[in-house]
Amino acid sequence: MEVVILAAGQGKRMRSALPKVLQPIAGRPMLEHVIAAAQALEARRICVVHGHGGEAVRARLQHAAVQWALQQPQLGTGHAVLQALPHLTDGDMALVLYGDVPLIGVPTLRRLEAAAGGERLALLTVELADPSGYGRILRDGAGRVVRIVEEKDASADERRVREVNTGILVAPVARLRDWLARLGNDNAQREYYLTDIIGMAVAEGVEVTTVQPDAIWETLGVNSKAQLAELERLHQRNIATRLMEDGVTLFDPSRIDVRGELLCGRDVEIDVNCVFEGRVEIADDVRIGANCVIRNARIGAGTRLAPFSHVEDTTTGRDCVIGPYARTRPGTTLGDGVHLGNFVEVKNSAIADDSKANHLAYIGDADIGRRVNVGAGTITCNYDGANKYRTTIGDDVFIGSDTQLVAPVRVGRGATLGAGTTLTKDAPEDQLTVSRARQISIPGWKRPVKKKAGE
């Protein structure tokens, strides 16, 4: 089977410079969701028909394994599919999808493909309590589909029909080529409707069959930011349901955002308002506090993330404790049992087992050994305005509060750095290193006093 995805619309109601099909659902362009569904069907070929903002669309999805066809100007859905025909092969079946219908399910599409067989025309239809705005499915007395009428061209009786066309269909490529060549635009919109091929199929004796989706929301399109937000919530709720079915405890399923791929082990708990972006892997028995943001990370078993922690491009070992208000940036690797407390930031650093930085520290471009204590207010001075340098700290080091380590510098195994030290040279193993001004007290010193007005 071959797939045609119509993605040429402007989306004026979006009121956005971003092409409609690039508007995001769960952190990915809507069109990317549709392409993923087509790929899951193992389609022989995927052709995307683009138009408005075509350069931006192609640039954003340049790595997708698709072919591109330009529709310019946009003269309706039939005209759009016509642009894809040079990429299609007679003898195959063609599935028509839409770049602004991002939640279409693969099981539904498989049933539609099966219904079409190798020679029938299969339509995906739904029955709506309020069918306003949709093309109506018209059937004869025996229940056979005879044609589709768009609402603007429908009579009063036809508008009362509740079964509507979703636009998604499967048809033989050879017949599709013939039907599209004969399309006219004698309608209220002066456009070439893809739906007109149904009447042609019926006239030629081609069987037209219909399939209902597993859920109506699969067929919902997006034409406004309000509809975009509605589908976002639907999608997130579906993700939350799948997570809970897999054993994840969500404190409130309506307050989680997954904008990528989230893989969870057993007995994972996730509090409210957490955001997961990219690929996130969470091992067994992990607890994630409220309002955390986790992006492209692997969280080790038994780890605890306290509220308001941000974890990005990070790998943690087992039984780590992070936060509250901690941040790990790209390139961070934590061993087992590492503690990062409130207002600790780590970037491009490796911290080995059982080391701790419990509060108010910046660790950048550093390699820290086992069982190291990083005191409050400690920073690695890794940037000289032009280049960045690394700090290396051995096992069993104790770093006093308010210490600055000016890289490149090494702290030997078992060393102690006194509070307030500014370390500019390597600190030897198993020694106390202190670098600060000598403390003095001045007897009789008087604090300056402000002069009063008139004095």
Swiss-Prot record:
Please state the pathway this protein functions in, per its UniProt record.
Answer: Nucleotide-sugar biosynthesis; UDP-N-acetyl-alpha-D-glucosamine biosynthesis; N-acetyl-alpha-D-glucosamine 1-phosphate from alpha-D-glucosamine 6-phosphate (route II): step 2/2; Nucleotide-sugar biosynthesis; UDP-N-acetyl-alpha-D-glucosamine biosynthesis; UDP-N-acetyl-alpha-D-glucosamine from N-acetyl-alpha-D-glucosamine 1-phosphate: step 1/1; Bacterial outer membrane biogenesis; LPS lipid A biosynthesis
> What Gene3D superfamilies does the annotation carry?
Hexapeptide repeat proteins, Spore Coat Polysaccharide Biosynthesis Protein SpsA, Chain A
For this UniProt record, the keywords arranged alphabetically read as follows:
Acyltransferase, Cell shape, Cell wall biogenesis/degradation, Cytoplasm, Magnesium, Metal-binding, Multifunctional enzyme, Nucleotidyltransferase, Peptidoglycan synthesis, Repeat, Transferase
- The positions annotated for binding UDP-N-acetyl-alpha-D-glucosamine are 6-9, 20, 71, 76-77, 98-100, 135, 150, 165, 223, 329, 347, 362, 373
Region annotation (Linker) maps to 226-246
Q: Which reaction does it catalyse?
A: alpha-D-glucosamine 1-phosphate + acetyl-CoA = N-acetyl-alpha-D-glucosamine 1-phosphate + CoA + H(+); N-acetyl-alpha-D-glucosamine 1-phosphate + UTP + H(+) = UDP-N-acetyl-alpha-D-glucosamine + diphosphate
CDD domains in UniProt: GT2_GlmU_N_bac, LbH_GlmU_C
Annotated active site residues, numbered on this chain, are 359
Superkingdom, natural source: Bacteria
Q: Write the Enzyme Commission number(s) for this entry.
A: 2.7.7.23, 2.3.1.157
Residues that hold Mg(2+) according to the record: 100, 223
Q: Which cofactor does it need?
A: Mg(2+)
User: What is written in the cofactor note of this entry?
Assistant: Binds 1 Mg(2+) ion per subunit.
Q: Does the keyword Transport apply?
A: no
The name this protein goes by in its record: Bifunctional protein GlmU
Annotated source species: Aromatoleum aromaticum (strain DSM 19018 / LMG 30748 / EbN1) (Azoarcus sp. (strain EbN1))
